[in-house]
Amino acid sequence: MAEYFFDTSAFVKRYHPEAGTQQVLALFSNPKNRVVISRLSLVEMQSAFAVKVHTGEISQSTAAMLWIQLMADLSSGAFEVLPVTDGHYQVAGELIERYGFRHRLRTLDALQLAVGLDKHHQAGVDGFVLADQALAEVASAEKLPIVFVS
């Protein structure tokens, strides 16, 4: 079974059609794949839906329906949610210290990467799925296998 850790930049594409959506749907639809996200992604998804409402991409009622769908997917086991621990915060700080001056590594991206790295070191992941080029560069430098969706 292949396991994929999704950053929110890619995960959002499951719920809102945009560049890279077909790649994301293909990963989800393969029964041999296991999808994992961090708890942070749930909050980031709420924010992503709110931004899409604010910019007029979707209506507030559509955002509510997308959230209901996401919660239904969570309940059905379509993906696993990993906790964010104190250790992840520490690693995120170390990643920012190591890469923040040369790369555009933002706080929440560093935290996502810390969770993904932890999962990779514990059990291995077949791909860190993302749509953020700056984060992809840092993840690659950390030897995570990258699946870039765009």
PLM region spans:
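Active-site neighborhoods of divalent-metal-dependent phosphate/nucleic-acid chemistry enzymes
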Residues: 78-131
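Acidic, PIN/NYN-like endoribonuclease modules and their adjacent C-terminal/linker elements
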Residues: 1-3, 117-150
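Short, well-structured N-terminal submotif of metal-dependent ribonuclease cores
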Residues: 1-41, 52-65
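Short glycine/serine- and small hydrophobic-enriched flexible loop segments
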Residues: 47-54, 117-121
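Aromatic- and histidine-enriched alpha-helix N-cap/loop-to-helix transition segments
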Residues: 37-43, 108-111
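Alpha-helix capping/helix-boundary segments
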Residues: 11, 41, 88, 112, ...
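Helix-adjacent hinge/juxtasegments
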Residues: 51-86
